[in-house]
Structure formats: structure tokens, C-alpha cells
Curated annotation (Swiss-Prot):
The keyword Zinc does not apply. Gene3D superfamilies: 1.20.5.170. GO terms for cellular component: RNA polymerase II transcription regulator complex. Residues 26-40, 108-118, 198-222 have a biased composition (Low complexity). Residues 1-10, 41-54, 81-92 have a biased composition (Pro residues). This is Putative transcription factor kapC. The keyword Cell wall biogenesis/degradation does not apply. PROSITE patterns: BZIP_BASIC. Residues 55-67 have a biased composition (Polar residues). Residues 103-126 are annotated as: Basic motif. Belongs to the bZIP family. Keywords: DNA-binding, Nucleus, Transcription, Transcription regulation. Pfam families: bZIP_1. It comes from Aspergillus terreus (strain NIH 2624 / FGSC A1156).
Length: 286
């Protein structure tokens, strides 16, 4: 047995339901457009009452059951769901500049070029300073090398001088140990009058004898004080000569002593020159 079909709805009921769905959709679109265009204005309230031709007809439950499900479904689906209003996004804030205006690209590029120019200038000045220091160090090195070479030359010269000095000092004979040139001899400090009195006293008691024998002691007695004075003079001259001429030998000093002639007084006019040897090794000419 086939189910009985529902009776077809009345045409007036179909048109009224479609008009109601269109009105609801139109109100929703208008409200959304007003909300987006004027967010601060309050949303207009829907009218409390609708015109009689817009109001849906109230039908009995029997009539509602007889509505075509296709029409009722399209009316329900045609109305979009109402979404809650979304808050409007706040405008983006500009970056914080802390009281300074943001620099443009051209100004920043100019500042970069100026900084690069200053850096190049500092680099060039530092390089020039380093080059000057290198030149100064090279000059000091050359001067040090010259002083080093001169030092070696002076050392060789000093060694040569020391060698020659040692060779020259080896030729000078050493003084005897009993002679001190810095202090005079004590036995030769007697004055000339004392020597004359001593000679006169020794000549008084001489015995008489032949002429040649008497003349010889008188000559020896007269030569005695002169020999002492001459020996003293020769010792002094020898000391001065050794200090002034360290490179000369004893022969030179002997020749100088032989060139000096002894002093003679009235009693020694006819005396002959005699040579005798002193204890100190120096030749004596009388």
C-alpha cells in the first residue's frame, strides 16, 4: 500500500514564506553593511512590528505540516547565521623615535659616506706615522752598526798600543833594589863647609915625604868632596832621566854623564881625570 502524499500547499502561503525569507536576508545584509561603515554608530534596531504584508501568516499546525519541505528548507538555509561583531583592529602605531625624526635614506647614506671618509683619513695618517717610525728605527740601526765597527777598530788599536808598550818597556833595565829615587841618601846630606873641615883635619897630620908621594894624597883629598857632590847630582839626573825617557837605555844616560865635566876648585887645577865605579853601578867621572 503506497503512503498518501501530503496535499500541496496553497500558493499564497508559498509567496508569503519566500517574502519573509527575503526580508530577513535583506535586514541582515543591511545591518552588516552599516556596522562596517559606521562602527561607532549604534546599530539600528529592527522595527518592532512589521507591515501586514511582510508578516507571515499564522497557519494552523495542519497547514504547517502541509508546507513543502523544499520551500521550508530553502528559507531556513537562505538566512545566513548571525555572527557576533568583531572588534575593529587598532591602527598600527609608528615605530618609537624617542623625540627624533626618522632619518631618510639619503641622509643615512650621506652619514655613511662621511664616516667612511673620516676612517680612510685616520687610516692614512696612522700608516704615515708607522712609516716614519720605521725610517727612524732604520737610522738607529745604521748608527748602531757604525758604532759597533768603530768600537772594534778602537779595541784593535788599544791592543796594538799595549803590545808596543810592553815591547818598549822590556828594553829598559830595572833599577837595583838598594836605590830609591824618591828619597835622597842620608850619607850625602852633609854640607860643603863640613866636608872642607873634615878634609883639612885629615890633611894636617900627614907625614913629610918625597914630593911625588905628597902630591898624590893631596889630589885624592881634594877630589873627595867633589865626588860626593857629583854622585848626588848624577843620582838626581838619573832619576829625572828615567822618568822623562822611559824608552832610552842605560848607554844614553852614560853618554850624558860622560859629557858633563866635573867642577874643580883652585886646589884641583892640575889634577887628572880618573874614573871609578860606584856601588850602585853608575859610572862616575872625576
Amino acid at each position: 500500500m503506497q503512503p498518501a502524499l501530503a496535499p500541496a500547499p496553497h500558493p499564497s502561503m508559498q509567496t508569503s514564506a519566500q517574502d519573509h525569507a527575503d526580508q530577513v536576508l535583506h535586514d541582515q545584509l543591511l545591518a552588516a553593511h552599516q556596522h562596517l561603515s559606521h562602527p561607532q554608530q549604534p546599530r539600528p534596531q529592527a522595527p518592532a512590528t512589521q507591515p501586514p504584508h511582510m508578516q507571515p501568516n499564522t497557519a494552523s499546525p495542519r497547514d504547517q505540516n502541509n508546507i513543502d519541505p523544499a520551500i521550508s528548507g530553502s528559507a531556513i538555509l537562505g538566512a545566513p547565521p548571525q555572527t557576533p561583531p568583531q572588534p575593529e583592529p587598532a591602527p598600527q602605531e609608528s615605530p618609537k623615535t624617542y623625540g627624533k625624526r626618522p632619518l631618510s635614506t639619503s641622509k643615512r647614506a650621506a652619514q655613511n659616506r662621511a664616516a667612511q671618509r673620516a676612517f680612510r683619513q685616520r687610516k692614512e695618517s696612522y700608516i704615515r706615522k708607522l712609516e716614519e717610525q720605521v725610517k727612524h728605527q732604520e737610522a738607529i740601526t745604521e748608527e748602531y752598526k757604525a758604532l759597533h765597527a768603530e768600537n772594534y777598530q778602537l779595541r784593535e788599536y788599544i791592543i796594538n798600543l799595549q803590545t808596543r808598550l810592553l815591547d818598549s818597556q822590556g828594553e829598559v833595565p830595572e833599577l837595583p833594589g838598594n836605590i830609591d829615587l824618591n828619597q835622597p841618601r842620608a850619607d850625602l846630606t852633609l854640607s860643603a863647609p863640613e866636608l872642607q873641615r873634615g878634609n883639612a883635619a885629615s890633611a894636617g897630620p900627614a907625614p913629610a915625604g918625597p914630593g911625588p908621594q905628597q902630591s898624590q894624597p893631596n889630589q885624592n883629598q881634594g877630589v873627595g868632596p867633589n865626588d860626593d857632590m857629583n854622585s848626588l847630582n848624577r843620582i838626581a839626573v838619573a832619576g829625572l832621566g828615567m822618568r822623562k825617557h822611559p824608552n832610552e837605555d842605560a848607554n844614553y844616560l852614560g853618554n850624558n854623564f860622560q859629557a858633563r865635566r866635573p867642577r874643580t876648585d883652585d886646589n884641583q887645577t892640575g889634577a887628572t881625570e880618573t874614573t871609578k865605579q860606584e856601588p850602585d853601578g853608575l859610572p862616575v867621572v872625576s
